[in-house]
């Protein structure tokens, strides 16, 4: 990991990201392929599907893809469009790790707390269970982490850094957490 500038300059300074999680991030994400922060979200399965819900393995979220069978004939199949291993590690492990940190040391814990409070105070989310709101807040904190990772990593690699859609099109400004 010491050979990767993103580890030395960014990941090592994020509370909740240890060497094992940093290894997962560095090995699973190709920052050269991520033109936008939302590209990382989509690859990690944290984007919003066409029905307005978070990406999942539900039938309506499957996409058609082509492949060559053993007779070299082109076939089509329905499958997921994200990296399930990465999604599990980011939401299940990294998200939980952020929550266990102090909000003073880990900005993503504060993002989690603020977003969860926002959800609990919103009339649109009152009917959702406590666990559902918790999962929504974890997902949001991980997405903010990925947005910061995108900016830091692309900058270190000398690649162009694009703004998020919410910044360019909607005028919503998010400050970097880390």
Per-segment meaning from a language model:
Residues 1-17:
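Helix-hairpin-helix/helix-loop-helix acidic hairpins
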Residues 10-11, 25-135, 139, 152:
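Phosphate-backbone recognition surface of nucleic-acid-processing proteins
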Residues 16, 57-64, 165-170:
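A glycine-rich phosphate-binding loop feature that marks nucleotide/adenosyl-phosphate handling sites
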Residues 18, 109-110, 159, 164-166:
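Short, low-complexity, polar/charged sequence segments that are solvent-exposed and flexible
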Residues 19-24:
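Central I-helix of cytochrome P450 enzymes
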Residues 51, 116-121, 167-178:
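Eukaryote-specific, cytoplasm-facing alpha-helical/coiled-coil scaffolding segments in long proteins
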Residues 129-165, 173-177:
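Basic, amphipathic alpha-helical segments enriched in Lys/Arg and hydrophobic/aromatic residues
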